[in-house]
Amino acid sequence: MTVSPRTSLGRLVPALLVSQVGFYVALLTPVQLLLTLRLSDLAGDDATSAFGIVTGAGALVALVFNPIAGRISDRTLWRFGRRRTWILTGSLAGAAALVALGAATSVWQVVLLWAFVQALFNFQYAATNALVADQVPAERRGGVSGLVGLTIAVGPLAGLALANGFEAGSARQWQAVAAVAAIAGVLAVVLLRDTRGVRGRGGENFLRTFWINPRHHPAFGWAWLVRFLITCAYASSSYNAFYLLQRFDVAEDEVGGMVLQLSLISVVLLAVTSVSAGYLSDAVRRQKPFIVFAGVVAAVALVLMAFAPSLAFVYVATGLLGIGTGAFFAIDLAMCVRVLPSTDDAGKDLAIINIANSLPQSVVPFVAPLLLAIGGYTALFGFLALLGVLGAVSVRRVPEIGQEHDESGRTAPITRHDLVSRTASDERTLA
């Protein structure tokens, strides 16, 4: 069998960025705007509750399908490539589901179609994330992670800008978002050179492979918890449209433009923070201080949102959230890749980590109606601020660069043998 070279960074990084932007255009544009408009038409005064049901159901589907997609990608033996296959399939099929969602005529259709969208695009997402572990050199992961972190803001910003070019609530908004997602998937596949997957071990129990014992891999477990807590804090952006409509009485035909303005502020600050934090982390060989910073900044911003007496405070808080988001997503992916139990199972293991991205999309909409009923947006944002602080505290249990946890939970330095073993494992996956 001929060993294929990995994708050069000059092609790999653009492929990662394009694929991730397409993913976030597809999923975050609806969450931040399109679903609000669609459900306001279909559910009227019950739109907030319907939004919670739709996004909660979609997040549960993502929770299930992301690790399954990662495992299938790890074990895909087709010549087209274990990651390319599912980036292309997920983006094209997911785009078709988005088009169908734009034509939905009832809330239950929105629930069903959004679940399909989540399932399909999570195949693309799992395969794309695994490429960082597959092909990015360890000493470059901070910088690459910082660039990839930009996509969580650039994606929905591009999607919001695109959607605002069409009539609010129209099917054309959904079609435009779907077209961008499909094109992004195709471009990423064209840029990538890929490898075949690893054959499953004889007698391997499919379901059992999804359990990673946190006692045996404590660093992995703590990294998962940190991502979950801080992602919950940043899930506040899902309620921006409702927040503006209900607390500040922004007109429905103006809310899209205002959400876009807030996103512009966030993305500019996120871009500066994400790129600089990623490269600075590689330079100083430290990751944890950046995560602590992100959690604390999120908490401060959410407290401002909770007690904002005017829109000026909302703009300031949004800027702080952009700074914190940039610092977090610049470092978090690199940190999670570093504590993976096995490079052969990178797709599945990163997908399990990504449950910490999906679960907040269920948890926050589930608890939000209760918190809103108790204390309005002050209670909701105050609760999310507390989670941000807990995430900042929890990261102290994750080992810093150059150390990993042994089975007893103590930290031990990564040895030359460990590095050689990981490199050899990577080379065995090349086809």
Predicted regions and their residues:
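Intracellular juxtamembrane helix-capping segments at the cytosolic ends
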Residues: 35, 123-136, 328-341
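Juxtamembrane intracellular "pre-TM" segments in multi-pass secondary transporters
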Residues: 1-10, 194-225, 412-421, 425-430
